[in-house]
UniProtKB/Swiss-Prot annotation:
Keywords assigned by UniProt, alphabetized: Antibiotic, Antimicrobial, Cytolysis, Fungicide, Hemolysis, Ion transport, Membrane, Secreted, Target cell membrane, Target membrane, Transmembrane, Transport
Record function comment: At high concentrations, acts as a pore former in cellular membranes and causes the leakage of the cells. At submicromolar concentrations, degranulates granulocytes and has a weak hemolytic activity against human erythrocytes. Also strongly inhibits the production of superoxide anions. Has a strong antibacterial activity against Gram-negative bacteria but is less active against Gram-positive bacteria. Also has antifungal activity.
Annotated GO biological process: defense response to bacterium; defense response to fungus; hemolysis in another organism; monoatomic ion transport
Entry's family note: Belongs to the non-disulfide-bridged peptide (NDBP) superfamily. Long chain multifunctional peptide (group 2) family.
The protein's name in its UniProt record: Opistoporin-4
Main location: secreted
Tissue specificity annotation: Expressed by the venom gland.
Coiled-coil residue windows: none
Compartments, record wording: Secreted; Target cell membrane
Propeptide: 45-61
Length: 61
């Protein structure tokens, strides 16, 4: 719904901010590992997924 779209848009903006870039790698690695585990892929495969698909998996699990 609209709320989820807003969260994704905001997440994109936040992830692109300078402050976030310092923290992003740790968070992204944790998210990649999580997504990879859920879909049975390797973290590097999970990292190559489109952002929206990646966020959908985080959302639905």
């Amino acid at each position: 719904g609209k709320v989820w779209d807003w969260i994704k848009k905001t997440a994109k903006d936040v992830l692109n901010s300078d402050v976030a870039k310092q923290l992003k790698n740790k968070a992204l690695n944790a998210a990649k590992n999580f997504v990879a585990e859920k879909i049975g892929a390797t973290p590097s495969e999970a990292g190559q997924m489109p952002f929206d698909e990646f966020m959908d998996i985080l959302h639905y699990y």
